[in-house]
Regions:
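A solvent-exposed interaction/effector surface
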Residues: 2-186
Length: 186
């Protein structure tokens, strides 16, 4: 087997714990819908005036150069807000405690509190079509939940590297939600 093929196979099939990627929170299983509380975290954020799915937005490379230059381990997932384009990397636990990390013109640092989201697990390529299809299913599910109310804009969550073939990719669509107060008893 040639080296490029071996590397592709390793990136595709080696479990994440063997690749050393720390996961910021548990995945939503593919095909499932759930609510989950995401933990408070320290984030690295890159922005573009272009939409996330527009080519040439440069978001990944801005963040990659930042983590590479600051010796921050890659974590998963990567979150993407669509319009304007925003990509978010989570810091691993050790890097989140570092005091030497500073924002740059390309990458902002942010703290986010714990938050409740409705989440759907998705298999397939990271495309606008797959995002829209999953979001429609998530909104339909949320319409059956009178105990939950949307609290923000939906966003994409990507678990795999760009080198993983689309059929093997795992993503999620999240919609921030809040519990509605129970109706008073009559």
């Amino acid at each position: 087997m040639r080296l490029p093929h071996l590397l592709l196979a390793m990136a595709t099939f080696v479990p994440s714990f063997l690749r050393g990627t720390e996961e910021a929170y548990p995945r939503t299983p593919m095909g499932s819908i759930e609510t989950k509380t995401l933990p408070a975290a320290r984030l690295m954020v890159a922005e573009s005036p272009k939409g996330y799915f527009e080519s040439g937005n440069g978001l990944f490379m801005k963040l990659f150069r930042y983590i590479d230059g600051n010796q921050i381990p890659m974590t998963s997932p990567v979150e993407a807000r669509l319009q304007p384009g925003v990509m978010v990397f989570y810091m691993d636990a050790g890097s989140a405690k570092r005091t030497d990390l500073q924002a740059t013109p390309q990458v902002k640092l942010a703290e986010t509190p714990a938050r409740l989201v409705a989440s759907i697990g998705v298999r397939g390529s990271y495309s606008r079509e797959n995002f829209d299809e999953a979001l429609a299913k998530l909104k339909a599910w949320l319409a059956t939940r009178p105990d939950l109310a949307p609290q923000g804009e939906p966003y994409a969550v990507y678990w795999n590297s760009p080198f993983v073939p689309g059929i093997f990719k795992h993503s999620e669509v999240h919609l921030p939600v809040a519990a509605k107060p129970a109706a008073p008893a009559k």
